[in-house]
C-alpha cells in the first residue's frame, strides 16, 4: 500500500467508527425519551398506545382508590374538565395525596384510556411544583408564583419524592 492509500484507509475507518457511534447514541436516545403531556394536551393530541410519556398535573380530589396489595388508581387533572385515569402498582411517595402536583411516567394500555404508570414523582413541599407542570398550569392561568407558604430558608427546593416499581 502506498502512503496515500494508507491515509485513505485510516480516514475511511475513522469515519465508519464515528458514524457507528452516532447511530448508537441516536438509538439510545430514541429509546429513553419520554415526552411530557398534561391531560388537556392529551385531549387535543392523543398518544399511540404503548408509547412512553410523562403525564403531569394534580391528583384529582376523591380519585385515589387503593386496590389489592400496592395497586393504586387515581386521576391526574390539570384543573380543567380534562382528567386521565392512572393505574400504578408499587409504593407511592410519602407525600403523594389528593390535590398535590404529580408527574407519572409510563404508557397507555393498548385497550382503553388507562395510563399505566411505572414511576410516580410527587410534589416535595407546599411551595415546590415540578417546573414542567408549573409552566403548563401557569399557561392556563391555574398556577401563580409564590403559591403556598414559604419553606424554611428555601429548604427542599428542587427536590422530588420518587417512587418506582
Curated annotation (Swiss-Prot):
It is found in: Cell inner membrane. The chain crosses the membrane at residues 8-28. One of its GO terms (cellular component) is plasma membrane. One of its GO terms (molecular function) is heme binding. InterPro entries: CcmE, CcmE-like_sf, NA-bd_OB-fold. The keyword Acetylation does not apply. SUPFAM superfamilies: Heme chaperone CcmE. The keyword RNA-binding does not apply. GO terms for biological process: cytochrome complex assembly. Heme chaperone required for the biogenesis of c-type cytochromes. Transiently binds heme delivered by CcmC and transfers the heme to apo-cytochromes in a process facilitated by CcmF and CcmH. This is Cytochrome c-type biogenesis protein CcmE. The lineage of its organism: Bacteria, Pseudomonadati, Pseudomonadota, Alphaproteobacteria, Hyphomicrobiales. The gene is ccmE.
Amino acid at each position: 500500500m502506498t502512503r496515500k492509500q494508507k491515509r485513505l484507509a485510516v480516514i475511511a475507518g475513522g469515519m465508519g467508527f464515528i458514524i457507528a457511534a452516532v447511530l448508537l447514541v441516536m438509538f439510545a436516545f430514541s429509546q429513553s425519551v419520554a415526552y411530557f403531556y398534561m391531560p388537556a394536551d392529551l385531549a387535543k393530541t392523543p398518544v399511540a398506545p404503548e408509547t412512553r410519556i410523562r403525564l403531569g398535573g394534580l391528583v384529582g380530589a376523591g380519585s385515589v382508590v387503593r386496590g389489592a396489595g400496592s395497586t393504586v388508581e387515581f386521576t391526574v387533572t390539570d384543573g380543567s374538565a380534562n382528567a386521565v385515569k392512572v393505574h400504578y402498582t408499587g409504593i407511592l411517595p410519602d407525600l403523594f395525596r389528593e390535590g398535590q402536583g404529580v408527574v407519572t411516567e409510563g404508557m397507555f394500555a393498548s385497550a382503553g384510556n388507562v395510563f399505566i404508570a411505572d414511576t410516580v414523582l410527587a410534589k416535595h413541599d407546599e411551595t415546590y411544583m415540578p417546573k414542567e407542570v408549573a409552566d403548563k398550569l401557569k399557561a392556563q392561568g391555574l398556577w401563580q408564583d409564590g403559591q403556598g407558604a414559604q419553606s424554611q430558608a428555601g429548604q427542599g427546593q428542587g427536590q422530588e419524592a420518587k417512587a418506582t416499581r
